[in-house]
Amino acid sequence: MEKYLIELLETNNRVIVPDLGAFIIRQQEPQELVFNDLLAFNDGMLTAHIKQLEGISMSKAQVKIEEFVDQVKKILTNGDIFHLENLGFLKMDDSSKIEFSVTK
């Protein structure tokens, strides 16, 4: 999933992972990648990207996203950190809010 997120962030300033949140590139100098767990609606962009690259149906692409989100939430709920290769990591704070830190 990280590969798809990175590909989309190369041409978009926001990528929403449905039911998880959005990765957003702030356009100030220096550019910064942030995460907003309030933007978790399905805008279809990630699903369509996976569909196109893998040659699968929209529903199968959506299932891939749902499985990824379930995996992330399970790890975070257990108090562990979820690493997003070449992006950073997600963790849950004491108030159950998902936080993102960029890999340095």
Description of each model-found segment:
Residues 1-104:
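Cytosolic/nucleoplasmic/matrix-facing N-terminal domains/tails
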